[in-house]
């Protein structure tokens, strides 16, 4: 008989009366009046093994096993006695009567029980191998595998070719920091780990491969958040001779296919499309969570002439904004709730949180409860009530500051209230999946510190055809042929139509204050390639980690990556990064300089 004939979790009634050989880990061992029960676990689940003292040698071995011992069991599949069936297990109607038990490897006492749901992330990542044995982690990584498989199936059917691009490449710092790799044979020179395969996939389009994809690692040396890692995985795609709409349609179908085949979710037949400007105006975010039924009301123009300086000053400032957020039935929020929200928005730079409770709208000013009503004229109050559509029992929150502060703070408040218990109880948030495309992004953003425009996405994104003239006259007006796929408030994919003409790419570099010499030094290989009849092309990259995180309902992408880094970009399992031997540094022609200590 083979060492293993079946997986534990797949032993069901179809094997009744058969002898099986199972291998796995002791999940639990229970001694019930001389009979030992072992819950044996492998990647497919659990099966109950019964060890009877009639077989002395086997029973002696069973007495010695403990949690996480790796064992082999041979025995007879039989039905469980009446009253002992476990409907929660696939194997819950049967058990295996053990004939032979072999300890393949003993285990020291584990630092935690695998079913302990209150472990710190530090403990889990330090003992990641054990953590990965937990059923939820097994589920997450198998889900990740299925998502990757379905992406490959779809792309293969659509004529895409899987082509690997280099991991050691040229540093072109335009955005996040590169991870640098010193070259031993080229002293003083460095490779960079790719932030994306962007330029190589464009070169593949010039090289006539027409449709490319790869599921690949990317690297960015940036501060980490719950949805970021220094190394992450993209489903990276590029195609020639398709316009923006055709590209969006192609990859919208791919995401629908992946969700249907992996978690049996039917996404919308057509994803709504929203311009960036509309998303910012209505939700304060370029990745709006459409499950939350709250929207901003624009008040900037209506607050220009009020005496209340908190509103009028930003309303008359070039980059200022005044916006309101009406919360239906929010009148029941307590002062403690409001104070909590006030402290919350301070995280995003807001100086405070103005509010008005609408008790009886028909009474005008007298029907309102608020510390700011006394500072507003009747006409201003009427404008607020009219524009927000406030009803009796509502509360209106206000943000007035620089547009970025207003968008960030009121946008975060919108999500916090919507997803709160109050929001759920009052129908302010829907369940399910709400995808959309956000399009028509600004081509450039102005960097005050550098006193120049920087690329909002990357400098290889094509401007909209009607905005080409702005590249040289007014770059700030230029919109890009860029598009992001957003799902439940997460950007799961982003892409664009690329620049395929060398003269347009050179104009973009000039708008970014990248001179001809610098452009040639950093991107000469791309500019040269574009001169050889480069086709119109575009593409998209999806964050595999993010997609799987959402599907799994996980709190962090670290829960869907086998061996992730912490928020300090460290691996607690291997203790990477770590010091290296002085000899290695000498071979690389590198001398370390100790970081300067902050002055007391």
Swiss-Prot record:
Q: Which GO terms describe its cellular component?
A: cytoplasm
Asked if the keyword Protein biosynthesis belongs to this entry, the reply reads yes
Location of this chain's protein in the cell: Cytoplasm
| Binding-site residues for L-aspartate, renumbered to this chain | 174, 220, 457, 498
Print the keywords alphabetically: Aminoacyl-tRNA synthetase, ATP-binding, Cytoplasm, Ligase, Nucleotide-binding, Protein biosynthesis
Q: Annotated region Aspartate: where?
A: 198-201
List the EC numbers from the record: 6.1.1.23
- UniProt catalytic activity: tRNA(Asx) + L-aspartate + ATP = L-aspartyl-tRNA(Asx) + AMP + diphosphate
Q: Where is this site: Important for tRNA non-discrimination?
A: 32, 83
Gene Ontology terms, MF aspect: aspartate-tRNA ligase activity; aspartate-tRNA(Asn) ligase activity; ATP binding; nucleic acid binding
Q: What Gene3D superfamilies is this protein classified in?
A: Bira Bifunctional Protein, Domain 2, GAD-like domain, Nucleic acid-binding proteins
Which residues does UniProt assign to the signal peptide?
Answer: none
Alphabetical list of Pfam families matching this protein: GAD, tRNA-synt_2, tRNA_anti-codon
Primary localization: cytoplasm
Query: Which residues of the sequence carry a binding annotation for ATP?
Result: 220-222, 229, 491, 543-546
| InterPro entries linked | Aa-tRNA-synt_II, aa-tRNA-synth_II, aa-tRNA-synth_II/BPL/LPL, Asp-tRNA-ligase_1, Asp-tRNA-ligase_1_N, Asp/Asn-tRNA-synth_IIb, AspRS_core, GAD-like_sf
Q: Its GO biological process terms?
A: aspartyl-tRNA aminoacylation
| Purpose | Aspartyl-tRNA synthetase with relaxed tRNA specificity since it is able to aspartylate not only its cognate tRNA(Asp) but also tRNA(Asn). Reaction proceeds in two steps: L-aspartate is first activated by ATP to form Asp-AMP and then transferred to the acceptor end of tRNA(Asp/Asn).
Family annotation (PANTHER family): ASPARTATE--TRNA LIGASE, MITOCHONDRIAL, ASPARTYL/LYSYL-TRNA SYNTHETASE
What protein family does this chain belong to?
A: Belongs to the class-II aminoacyl-tRNA synthetase family. Type 1 subfamily.
Among NCBIfam families, the record links this protein to: aspS_bact, PRK00476.1
Q: How does it assemble?
A: Homodimer.
What is this protein identified as?
Aspartate--tRNA(Asp/Asn) ligase
Species of origin reads Burkholderia pseudomallei (strain 668)
User: What lineage is on file?
Assistant: Bacteria, Pseudomonadati, Pseudomonadota, Betaproteobacteria, Burkholderiales
Gene behind this chain?
aspS
């Amino acid at each position: 008989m083979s060492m293993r004939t079946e997986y534990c979790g797949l032993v069901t009634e179809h094997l009744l009366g058969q002898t099986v050989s199972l291998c796995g880990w002791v999940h639990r061992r229970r001694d019930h009046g001389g009979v030992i029960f072992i819950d044996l676990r492998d990647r497919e689940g659990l099966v109950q093994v019964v060890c009877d003292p009639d077989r002395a040698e086997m029973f002696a071995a069973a007495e010695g096993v403990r949690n996480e011992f790796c064992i082999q069991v041979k025995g007879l599949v039989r039905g469980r006695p009446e009253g002992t069936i476990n409907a929660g297990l696939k194997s819950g109607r049967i058990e295996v009567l053990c004939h032979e038990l072999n300890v393949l490897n003993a285990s020291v006492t584990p630092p935690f029980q695998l079913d302990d749901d209150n472990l710190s992330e530090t403990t889990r990542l330090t003992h990641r191998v054990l953590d990965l044995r937990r059923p939820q982690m097994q589920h997450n990584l198998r889900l990740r595998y299925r998502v990757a498989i379905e992406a490959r199936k779809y792309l293969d059917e659509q004529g895409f070719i899987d082509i690997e691009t280099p991991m050691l490449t040229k540093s072109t710092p335009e955005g996040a920091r590169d991870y640098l790799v010193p070259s031993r044979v080229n002293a003083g020179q460095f490779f960079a780990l790719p932030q994306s395969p962007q330029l190589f996939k464009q070169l593949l389009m010039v090289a006539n491969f027409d449709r490319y994809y790869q599921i690949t690692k990317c690297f960015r040396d940036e501060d980490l958040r719950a949805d970021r890692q220094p190394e992450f995985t993209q489903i990276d795609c590029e195609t020639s001779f398709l316009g923006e709409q055709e590209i969006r349609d192609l990859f919208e179908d791919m995401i629908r296919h992946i969700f249907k085949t992996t978690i049996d979710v039917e996404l919308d037949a057509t994803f709504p499309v929203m311009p960036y400007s509309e998303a910012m105006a209505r939700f304060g975010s370029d990745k709006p969570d459409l499950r939350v039924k709250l929207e901003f009301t624009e008040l900037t123009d209506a607050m220009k002439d009020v005496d209340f300086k908190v509103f009028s000053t930003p309303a008359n400032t070039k980059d200022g904004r005044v916006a309101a957020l009406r919360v239906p039935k929010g009148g029941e929020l307590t002062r403690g709730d409001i104070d909590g929200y006030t402290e919350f928005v301070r995280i995003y730079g807001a100086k405070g949180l103005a509010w008005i409770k609408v008790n009886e709208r028909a009474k005008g000013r007298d029907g309102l409860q608020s510390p700011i009503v006394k500072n507003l004229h009747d006409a201003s109050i009427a404008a607020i009530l009219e524009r927000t559509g406030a009803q009796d029992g509502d509360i209106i929150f206000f943000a007035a500051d620089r547009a970025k502060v207003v968008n960030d703070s009121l946008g975060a408040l919108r999500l916090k209230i919507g997803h709160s218990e109050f929001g759920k109880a009052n129908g302010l948030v829907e369940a399910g999946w709400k995808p959309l495309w956000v399009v028509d992004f600004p081509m450039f953003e102005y960097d005050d510190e550098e006193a120049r425009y920087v690329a909002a996405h990357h400098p290889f994104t094509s401007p909209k055809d009607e905005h080409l003239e702005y590249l040289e006259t007014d770059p700030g007006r230029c919109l890009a042929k860029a598009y992001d796929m957003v799902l439940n408030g997460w950007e799961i994919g982003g892409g664009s139509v690329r620049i395929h003409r060398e003269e347009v790419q050179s104009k973009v570099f000039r708008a970014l204050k990248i001179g001809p010499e610098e452009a040639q030094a950093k991107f000469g290989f791309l500019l040269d390639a574009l001169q050889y009849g480069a086709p119109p092309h575009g593409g998209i990259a999806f964050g595999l980690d993010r997609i799987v995180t959402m599907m799994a309902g996980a709190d962090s992408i670290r829960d869907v990556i086998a061996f992730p880094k912490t928020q300090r970009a460290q691996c607690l399992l291997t203790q990477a990064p770590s010091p290296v031997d002085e000899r290695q540094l000498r071979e690389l022609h590198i001398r370390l300089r100790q970081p300067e200590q902050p002055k007391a």
